[in-house]
UniProtKB/Swiss-Prot annotation:
Induction: By phenol. Its EC number is 1.14.13.7. GO terms for molecular function: 2 iron, 2 sulfur cluster binding; metal ion binding; phenol 2-monooxygenase activity. CDD domains: fer2, phenol_2-monooxygenase_like. The keyword Iron-sulfur applies. Residues 3-93 form the 2Fe-2S ferredoxin-type domain. This is Phenol hydroxylase P5 protein. It comes from the Bacteria. Its cofactor is FAD; [2Fe-2S] cluster. InterPro entries: 2Fe-2S_ferredoxin-like_sf, 2Fe-2S_ferredoxin-type, 2Fe2S_fd_BS, Beta-grasp_dom_sf, Cbr1-like_FAD-bd_dom, FAD-bd_FR_type, FNR_nucleotide-bd, OxRdtase_FAD/NAD-bd. Pathway: Aromatic compound metabolism; phenol degradation. The multicomponent enzyme phenol hydroxylase is formed by P0, P1, P2, P3, P4 and P5 polypeptides. It comes from Acinetobacter pittii (strain PHEA-2). Residues 102-201 form the FAD-binding FR-type domain.
Length: 353
């Protein structure tokens, strides 16, 4: 059995299967409702029901308060129709967003390598090509682990049927521990995607600043490769932050890109280099490297930030103090399952601040 859900004010009607959430059905039919966590904890996908019956699902009482439930508000990521419905949603349409349909795929692990002492690089061969926009992510289901995990795609969309992931081991994390200790080449995984609205605004030709920390390098790497491969002429800056030299992974890749593309700049920063690193580059946090490089004058750029929340917050503060407008800053916050247990989203948050 399926139900018809009409989304106002755009007037689009989608078909939602029994036991399927409104959000999942919408994304699979090319309607990109606003969302972030996908687990009922952040409230980004809140919509107003104007007609129909439904199961509100496992929405957090913090994300959907009792008074909102009484007003027939629901979270699209949790709500399952029990009749035809009409909802009102704030659908943000961006001309640069391609809106590829979310689909299910079977993936085979074809390569596993150590990118750093704490980060694995995983390459997957999919059962058919996937269309995605550089900066987006996939959800991965691991054997005998409840729920899916979100990981950003690190390779360029030009690699047909291939998905590269950078996965940091999280202390106590079931999925990342499985990846680091049990996953092997030849293993098969169920994935779905693409998800997310973290992407380059190509119609805006301002120079681009990418700021990445830890495994948050994955999305910027994909976006930078895509821009350079397409012949984009804007100046592209990558500021990569790490603790020490061992954690500064893929450095050789970006140093080669500097040689190959005159419009690409690479500025790595280590906040705690070891004596044996013999580090001569910038020492300090990555947001401090940005302020130092641009001498606190970042106006006239677009900025794309990806990494842990504390890095994102520091970088936003630095950029705005350096005269970059809020509308020109786009972020992807990496949160682990442990963060979710503390009441935050369990997946990456993708937003324009």
């Amino acid at each position: 059995m399926s139900y018809q859900v009409t989304i106002e004010p755009i007037g689009t009607t989608i078909e939602v299967e029994e036991d399927q959430t409104i959000l999942d059905a919408a994304l699979r039919q090319g309607v990109w409702l606003p969302f972030a966590c996908g687990h009922g904890t952040c409230g980004t996908c809140k919509v107003q029901v104007t007609d129909g019956f439904y199961d509100v699902g496992e929405a957090s009482p913090f994300a959907l308060m009792d008074i909102e439930r009484d007003e027939n508000k629901v979270l699209a990521c949790c709500c399952k129709p029990q009749s035809d419905m009409v909802i009102e949603a704030d659908v943000d349409e961006d001309p640069d967003f391609l809106g590829h349909l979310v689909q299910d795929y079977q993936a085979t692990v074809i390569e596993i390598k150590d990118l750093s002492p704490t980060i694995k690089g995983i390459r997957l061969q999919l059962d058919r090509p996937i269309e995605f926009q550089a900066g987006q992510y996939i959800n991965v289901q691991f054997p005998n682990i409840e729920g899916t995990r979100a990981f950003s795609i690190a390779n360029s969309p030009s690699e047909v049927g291939i998905v590269e992931l950078h996965i940091r081991k999280v202390e106590g994390g079931a999925a990342t521990t499985y990846v680091h200790e049990q996953l092997a080449t030849g293993d098969q995984l169920d994935i779905s995607g693409p998800y997310g609205q973290f992407f380059v605004r190509k119609s805006d030709d301002q120079n681009a600043i990418f700021i990445a920390g830890g495994s948050g390098l994955s999305s910027p790497q994909s976006m930078i490769l895509d821009l350079l491969e397409s012949g984009d002429s804007r100046t592209i800056y990558l500021f990569q932050g790490a603790r020490d030299l061992a954690e500064l992974y893929n450095r050789e890749l970006f140093e080669q890109l500097v040689k190959d593309y005159p419009n690409f700049r690479y500025i790595p920063a280590l906040n705690a280099p070891k004596p044996e690193d013999q580090w001569t580059g910038f020492t300090g946090f990555v947001h401090e490297a940005v302020a130092d490089y641009f001498e606190n004058r970042c106006g006239g750029h677009k900025a794309y930030l990806c990494g842990p929340p504390i890095m994102i917050d520091s970088a936003i503060s630095t950029l705005m103090q350096s005269r970059l407008f809020e509308r020109d800053i786009h972020t992807e916050r990496f949160l682990s399952a442990a963060d979710g247990a503390a009441g935050q989203s369990r997946s990456a948050l993708f937003k324009h601040i």
